[in-house]
Each structure stands twice: as structure tokens, then as C-alpha cells.
């Protein structure tokens, strides 16, 4: 005869094992996000662009296409942006977030699962230039159940590329590659050498909407010369020379690109100054080097690099030759003048001595 206590122990152990197994299974089951909000599904639109761009007038449309018979029509309100909309800086890009929602029109006919495909609609007739559209597809599953003698939406799930997600998000990028940067050189001073060339270095940093820096092309135009010299920068800093009236112009730059131009210091009796215009705004005005041997940079006081916007971008370096004494004596020629003076003094002294000797003989 089997001991009742032993039977009880076996039953208790089995119950505990079953309970543990059930707990482990529940803990391992992934939680599926429910995107249902009172029978609607929110959609977020992130419109991103680099600094230096004005927000364009653009409207984004969406479609929820039914994949299940007897499914209700799904409606989605458009999202529009206009000039003046301001974004929030995120990952070096300005992002303007707006929301809409999917709503279902009518009454569900029966319980079950209803499947929809949600996409962003590209309207060729209203497509805005330089805007990249999002080609993402979301699968929406709507679960309808009986509740209190009525048909209600129990939950709604969304998935992208086979993975469940808690949010339907579409991203669009606005990027332009038509900006221009001009770097020009001037010299001032009565004795300034208008043909003397000065050494410069420019270093670019890619726009946050670009994946790589790439190469930038420009031309140097020399004063009084109808020919131009091609310039190609490739990732690293680029060195160049400019004299009075010369100009380096870059074209087709991605808006949002940043840069720093430096005039190398030299002991040449010239003191450089610089003025910078970024996206039609003057950000550096008549900054002067402490002395002629100090390199002069366009970098802003807060350490930020200079921005290339969709409007005017221009750097003007002006080198001023040092003041000359009122006598008109140029210090570089002083040694020669002293030699001439010594020779004259020696000649006069010799003449006086000869006259004195002649006087004594008489």
C-alpha cells in the first residue's frame, strides 16, 4: 500500500514543476506593443534638414491599404510643413516632428484580424525638389472582438520588415547641393605690393545630411587675368595662394557643410584682418591678427566652424601694410642709405683735410 504522505509529496512536487514551467514560459514570451489609441493609430513624421536651410512648403500624404476582405476604410490626415517652421537640433540635424493618425471609418462587420499596409504616398505632381521620401512599409494588424454585445478593437499591432514596433515613424530629409563659398583677398597701404601672394588653408567638414565629405570643386580667378585655375579638395585640408584682387570660389556645395579658412602668419610687414558672412549673416567682422606673424582664422569666438548656407557665403581677408615714417624713408632701404651717408661724410672729410694741408703749405 502506497503511503499517502508520499503521494501528497509527489503531487505537490509536480504542481510546483508545472507552475515553474508556466512562469518561465510567460517570462520568455515577448510583449507585443499595442499601438491602439481609442481605435486610432498614431503616425509620426520627422522632417530633417541641415542648418542653413529654410523649411520648404511641402505636404506629405499616407495610405493604409486593406489586405483583408470586409475591412473598414482607413483614413489618414496629411502632414504639412511651411516656411518658418522651426526644428529641434538632433544628431547635428534640425528635426521638425509632427503627428497624424489612422482612423477607421464605419462599423466592423465581424470579429477577427484585419490587416493593412501603411505607406507614405509620393505624389509626382506635387513632389518637392530636394526632398527624400521614406519608402518604409508597415503592416498593421487590427484585432476586433465581441465586448458587451458590441464589436470593439481589442488591440492593434504594427511591424516593419517583420519586426514588431511600438511606433509608426516616417523620416524625410531636405538637402540641397547648390551652395557657393567665395574667399577673396585685398591689400591696403601706400607701399603694399599688389602682386605678393599670401598662403591660406581651408578645411571642410561634411554636412550632417551627407554620408561622406567627398570632393569639392572651385576656381581661382587672378586679378587682371581672364583665365581661371581649377581647385579640387578631397577630404583633407587644401592649401592655396591669393594676392590682391584674387578670388577662390567653390560651387555646388552641400548646404550645412562647415569650414575654417586660415591665413598663415608670415614676417612680411602685413597685418591681416578678416570678415565672414555666413548664410547672408555677418558672423565675424574685421577680426585682426595680434601681429603679422600670427595665423588668422575664420573660426567663430565660441569655437564653432563657419556654416555654408543656401544664401550668401563669403570670406574677405584684408592685409594692411605697416605705416611708413613721414620722411618717406623705407626701413628696408635704410642700410643702403646709411652706406651712402657714410660715403658722403668720408668724401667731405677727405676734402676738408686736403684743403687744410694745402693751407698749411702756403
What residues fall within each predicted segment?
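Solvent-exposed loop/turn and edge beta-strand elements of beta-rich ligand-binding domains
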Residues: 2-362
